[in-house]
Amino acid sequence: MTIKNLPADYLLAAQQGDIDKVKICLALGVDINTCDRQGKTAITLASLYQQYACVQALIDAGADINKQDLTCLNPFLMSCLNGDLTLLRIILPAKPDLNCVTRFGGVGLTPACEKGHLSIVKELLAHTEINVNQTNHVGWTPLLEAIVLNDGGIKQQAIVQLLLEHGASPHLTDKYGKTPLELARERGFEEIAQLLIAAGA
């Protein structure tokens, strides 16, 4: 390990979950938030490679958990996108910025709803004040994504129900003026349509 290669050694150590080496690099003065060419910091790399103990060690050492890479990802958004509940439960106590958005303009809840990550949706709605009505760059809320971008199955029905119970509006339309109810019916998702009607749609 040389001072010249310190940033690269540090980032690789985080990716590999080598906490001792990470601590040595920090003791030698490496910038805790240094990043690679993709803009990924050590804590983002540790998160990506599910090096959970290393993620916690970097949080404890004061790493910036909100810094986003060139694709707008950070540990919090990564946990939501990938359905990584273990990572989310490590990150939430560190108080991540819930208003950080993906490159599509959605908060962490949005991709979790789209991809059917029910456990992530439950965790976010139970333990945070995340915006359930955030509209992304294409005009979709988490509720609309849960309907439009998945299969309407049991998991998606549960996500829709949770969103409605936590204040998601059944009236917010997409950019073409279509309501969640119209979009659910267009796709033949009658169970979801009934949930929306019960919520006042």
Per-range role (PLM):
Residues 21, 53-54, 86-87, 119-120, ...:
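Conserved ankyrin/ankyrin-like repeat signature
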